[in-house]
């Protein structure tokens, strides 16, 4: 039997932004992608940014309640990669509810996801952040350890 990965196993301390500097949607996307590049996870930032901008043109990934989940598949990704960023001030992101975004989950996956983890992972993130208590606790995290604790507590054991 294949063991399902818990959410926190997809995250990396190098891909955690305790306080984002971005003031606009474009700056937020750039800041999230910059972290991927600085960590050595990707080489071509422009390729990822173009893909994210195309995805945003189809409809905002600002899903409401202060959360955005920019996501997509790219040849630049050889596995699922996730960047978490928090903005205390909030960023205008053309969200479905027109509210500023405080919590960002950038999710990238390879074009061919043999393990079929991408969509289930995306679903797990959405399920987790539906809980207003989890969103509130994520908005307060100041360290990667705090972040992991909230993720772990917010998941039901399957």
Please place each PLM-identified region on the residue numbering.
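Cytosolic covalent-transfer regions centered on His/Cys nucleophiles
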Residues: 1-158
């Amino acid at each position: 039997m294949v063991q399902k990965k818990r959410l926190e196993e997809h995250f990396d301390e190098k891909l955690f932004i305790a306080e984002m500097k971005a003031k606009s949607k474009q700056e937020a996307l750039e800041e999230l992608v910059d972290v991927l590049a600085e960590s050595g996870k990707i080489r071509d930032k422009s390729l990822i940014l173009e893909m994210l901008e195309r995805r945003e043109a189809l409809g905002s990934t600002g899903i409401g309640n202060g959360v955005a989940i920019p996501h997509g598949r790219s040849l630049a990704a050889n596995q699922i990669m996730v960047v978490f960023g928090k903005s205390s001030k909030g960023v205008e992101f053309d969200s479905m509810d027109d509210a500023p975004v405080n919590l960002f989950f950038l999710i990238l996956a390879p074009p061919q996801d043999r393990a079929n983890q991408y969509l289930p992972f995306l679903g797990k993130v959405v399920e987790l952040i539906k809980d207003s208590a989890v969103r509130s606790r994520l908005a307060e995290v100041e360290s990667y350890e705090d972040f992991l604790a909230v993720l772990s507590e917010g998941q039901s054991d399957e």
